[in-house]
Amino acid sequence: EITLKIIDDGIMNGFSTMIKLAGYIMFFSIAADFAGHLPLPGTALSGCVIGLLEITNGIYTVSGTEWPAEIKYLSAMAMVSFGGISGICQTASMLAKLQSSIRTYVIFKLLNAMLATLFTAALVCYLNHQ
């Protein structure tokens, strides 16, 4: 039988999850902003470091570089397919109650990023030679 307690618990669990994820997003957005102020040589390197932390700001930074469009596209593909450390921490937070290995997840995210970048590079090369 569905009671108000079950509904209340479901609502509170949903809010708790959303607040937790929002906290990670805010934390890594702030960390990415700090990383953008590090004395790194060039906007491109800064964009890659920011993208490693948090993909949205990383892609935005890389898009403003003077890199060729193909390199910007490859960088964005790598960032999106990896998901950033922010995404990994969000996933780890959600999997904390399970007995899942975050290490395995990270390995597969890295593999996903490598494969996506390689396939994208092959596609870019193919399209540039048409």
Give the location of each predicted region:
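Secondary-structure junction/capping motif
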Residues: E1-I2, S101
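C-terminal transmembrane helix pair
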Residues: A69-Q130
